[in-house]
Each structure stands twice: as structure tokens, then as C-alpha cells.
């Protein structure tokens, strides 16, 4: 069981925050128990703020049986009259009072929901059982007439500080000790959506990647909300047109939507033949996408879209009731975790490509042989690493820290020998150069002095020097 469903609050007392709203709903339901008929409640708030959880907990606390009609169902005039009309004034088979929930009434639009709003208003006027409507956007034009006949209760986003304790409690129960700093980042990233925060926590726990870098790589939450709503409709509905419409307005590329659906098929469908048929339609959608890119003919796009949405919706025999937590594709998490590794291999390939004068694609073919040499012949590996100018990080990526240390040591030893050899060569060269300079220097010619001057110098040498005495000064 997914964590959102596993740890979903069953009673009002278990729900975090929104104390004022909980009290308001309790007072409203108690009025009904005292045979008063107050206006229906229109719960308005962003996805994940707890609208569904509040209605379920309220029904559990007061022993009401829930009858739900949500966005994955056709909700035109006839269907609403058939399902909701009778339930609005009678008890269930078990004799319990009935609580009717019309989910996401702001999504009532198009031909499939024609006349739905007007029929809801008619039922509200004659209802004897409590009715709760939920919506994400109260200001949609389609809700103008509903706003006048309902008691509007606005639910805000849950504060980050209220989400952190929930995440801490779940992680401890699942046997994970996660730092509060990480939990706060997850909670803050969820933007007040408790359901999304729990989904992110479960996704990170599956890969055991509770480090700050991976947490910050989580996708934008606004994007998740739109995809989450779309795939929920695809998995819940059994109508071709509703399923096809669910993906029509998504901003995400079709490949991303396909990954989301593929990831969550086994979470929703339980029968082997349903899972098999759903994946078969997804694989056919993938073939059409391949043809789109190969032939640049985008007319095939609609077939891929129909197969991955309606094809998956119609793969089941019947609709699965209950709420399922849909997970973001694990491939996104794996890509995030391998980001550093992919960067490292790219650097290595660039260096091999540059030195060997080949493409990176061709260099990739040789990388396995290079790894083998480095792991089994350290001396040869050291020479290759010097040639390719690999850094410590490059060598560690290709081998491991122990082998990398050995190779780096050999590389340093070779550098020392090379430096000593170069030093000796330079010394020899300098000596040779000096000798050569001496040999090539021309001798200075002696200047011949006149004979008389020479004789005079000789006579001066022969005469004894006079001894200096005290008398010589007088």
C-alpha cells in the first residue's frame, strides 16, 4: 500500500491543522443530525490541501456512508439525477445516513458533462441528506450559480511547519531516520500539498537518496499537480472522450506523460490481463511517437495520445474505487542521481576524443578496454592516464579509489624521474654551451710597446728601492 493511503487520517482528530474548518464542518453535520437542513458545503482549496481527507474523516466520525461522484465519471444531467438524485433523500442499503460528495465541480465542462450544474442545483433544493462539493477554483464561471446555493468553506495550503512532523512520523514508522533539514526542504517544495510531500518522501525512500542534492532535484510541484490530475482521470474513467480530454491541455510533453502513466499502471490495476493490455497500448503509443520523430509527420501524434490515454483507460474491466497515490517516474529520480556520473564520463570521453582524434561516440567503444587496462596493469595505466591527461576524479571514475591511488603514485614517480632526467640533461647542455663559448671566443692581440719604453722599465726594475727613513722627511 502506498504511503498516502497507508497514513491517511481516518478521523478528524488525526488531521493536521485546519482546526477552524474542522469545527465548522462538525457544527454543520450536527445540524443535520438534529433534523435541520443547512446549505450544502462547497469546500474550496488547492489540490492536496485535504478536501477529500476531510470528507472521509467526517463520514467516519459520524457514521455516514459516502457516495462519491468525481472528475473521472461522466457527470451529465441524466447520470447526476440517476446516482445523486435518489441518494439525496434516502438512506443506504445498510440503513446508514448518506453523505454525498461531488468532487471537483469546477471541472464540469464539455459535452460529457452537459447540464450537470443545473441538475446539481435542482437536487440541492430538494435534498434531505448532506451534500459536500469540492473545487480547486471558486471563480470559474461554471460555479457562479452554485456559489449562491452553497455555504463556501475555503481551505488554505498547509503550512510547512505542519507538514514536517507528518513526514517525520511516517519516516520513523517506515524505518528511515531523515534529517529535519531534508524534511523541511521536502515540505517547503510541496507548497502546502501534504499528499505531494508524502509522495516525494516515498519516492526518495525507494531509492534511499535522502541527500540535499537529490531533494532539490525534485520536479516543480505545479507541474506535478496537473499531471497528477490527468493520470487520475485516465486510471479512474472508463470513457474514451473523458480520458482523451484529460491530456489535451497539459503543458508537459507527451513523452513525460507516457512515463507517468507507465510508472503507475501496476499501482492502479490489479489484474494481470489489464496490466498487460495497458502496457501493450503504451508500447504501441511509443511506436507511433518513434515514427513521428523519424518521419517528422506530426499527424501520427494523435494516435500516440489516444493509445496512451484512452487505451490505458479502457484496458480495465471495471473502475477501481478508492484513492491511489500516483508516484513520479523512477527514471526521473535515477537520472537525477546519475547526473554527476554522466558528467564524469562525458569529461573522460572528451579527453580520449581530443588525444585520439576520434568522436566521443567512437571513444565510448574503447572505454571498457581502458578500464580493464587500468585495473589490471597499473604501470601501463599510469602511462595512458598521463597521455590522456586524466585527473584524480577521472581515474577514480574509471577504476576505484584504491587503484586510482596506486596509479597516481606511479604517475608522480614517473614525473620525478622525468624531472631528474631533464635536470641532468639541462646541466650537461649548459656545461657544453660554456665550453663551446670559451673555444669560440677570439684571443686578444698583444700591443707591442716601443723598445725605449721597455728598456726604461727594465732599468727601473733593476734599481733598488730607497728605504724610507725619518731623515728623508727633512
UniProtKB/Swiss-Prot annotation:
UniProtKB keywords: ATP-binding, DNA replication, Nucleotide-binding
CDD domains from the UniProt entry: AAA (cd00009), HLD_clamp_RFC (cd18140)
Disulfide bonds: none
Residue spans of biased composition, Basic and acidic residues class: 415-468
Binding site for ATP: 45-52
InterPro entries: AAA+_ATPase, ATPase_AAA_core, P-loop_NTPase, Rep_factor-C_lsu, RFC_lid
Region (Disordered): 415-474
Gene Ontology molecular functions: ATP binding; ATP hydrolysis activity; DNA clamp loader activity
Assembly with partners or alone: Heteromultimer composed of small subunits (RfcS) and large subunits (RfcL).
Family: Belongs to the activator 1 small subunits family. RfcL subfamily.
Role noted for this protein: Part of the RFC clamp loader complex which loads the PCNA sliding clamp onto DNA.
The protein's name: Replication factor C large subunit
